[in-house]
């Protein structure tokens, strides 16, 4: 019996890993907790999970962001939006026949390394049932920005406190409000631009200049 490979996640890295597994003739399966390929690039207005914002675009040009063996369409702008990126990832998965190897709505809950070097993977299947399987190889492609980290500050704050993971787009309730954004990374800068469209004033607090 051939050795098995488990790929966790069907985002940009996961489908690339799957394509290479397929071309190498490996026996593999992809476990994806959502119902689409694309990972964080699949927009969903619901909170409680990581995804792009309503107006997210690439911050690097398409020529620097595309797969070397599957270029982005010529009619895409230099900086595609998230809808176009999702279409691109879906096209990639179809082109390389990856869909047949993906188990959607399968959430990995725990992975344990065995004494013989194999991996025991626990997951919930698409019916919510607990399952587990042994794989000889494991490829973790689920990213590392799915669990929000909240800073701890002394004192009390009575206004609305929102983590960037929960942000999907500016709401009407932001209009004419004062907004403080903690941090100056990609998420912070994206949200600052969106907030500035409707808020009274937007401040950014950063650890270093």
Segments from the language model and where they lie:
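N-terminal Rossmann-like FAD-binding beta1-loop-alpha1 element of flavoenzymes
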Residues: 3-30, 189-195
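Feature captures the FAD/FMN-dependent oxidoreductase FAD-binding
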Residues: 77-142, 146
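Glycine-rich active-site loop/strand segments that organize a redox cofactor
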Residues: 33-36, 40-91, 205-209
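Short, conserved catalytic or adaptor-binding loops enriched in Gly and charged residues
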Residues: 56-59, 97, 152-157
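Conserved acidic residues
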Residues: 4, 136, 177
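Short, solvent-exposed loop/turn segments at secondary-structure junctions
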Residues: 13, 35-37, 47-48, 70-72, ...
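Glycine-rich dinucleotide-binding loop and its adjacent helix/turn
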Residues: 75-77, 81-85, 101, 140-198, ...
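The conserved SAM/SAH-binding core of class I Rossmann-like methyltransferase domains
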Residues: 8, 31-32, 182, 205
């Amino acid at each position: 019996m051939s050795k098995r490979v488990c790929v966790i996640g069907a985002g940009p890295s996961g489908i690339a890993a799957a394509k290479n597994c397929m071309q190498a003739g490996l026996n593999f399966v992809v476990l994806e907790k959502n119902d689409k390929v694309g990972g964080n690039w699949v927009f969903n207005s619901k909170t409680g999970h990581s995804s792009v914002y309503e107006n997210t675009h690439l911050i690097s040009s398409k020529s620097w962001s595309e797969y070397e063996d599957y270029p982005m369409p010529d009619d895409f702008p230099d900086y595609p939006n998230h809808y176009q990126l999702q279409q691109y990832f879906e096209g990639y998965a179809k082109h390389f026949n990856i869909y047949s190897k993906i188990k959607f709505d399968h959430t990995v809950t725990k992975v344990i390394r065995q004494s013989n070097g194999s991996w025991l993977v626990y997951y919930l299947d698409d019916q919510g049932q607990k399952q587990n399987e042994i794989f000889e190889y494991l490829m973790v492609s689920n990213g590392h920005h799915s669990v929000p980290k909240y800073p701890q500050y002394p004192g009390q704050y009575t206004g609305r406190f929102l983590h960037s993971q929960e942000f999907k787009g500016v709401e009407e309730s932001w209009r004419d409000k004062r907004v403080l954004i903690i941090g100056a990374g990609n998420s912070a800068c994206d949200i600052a631009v969106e907030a500035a469209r409707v808020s009274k004033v937007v401040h950014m607090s950063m650890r270093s200049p």
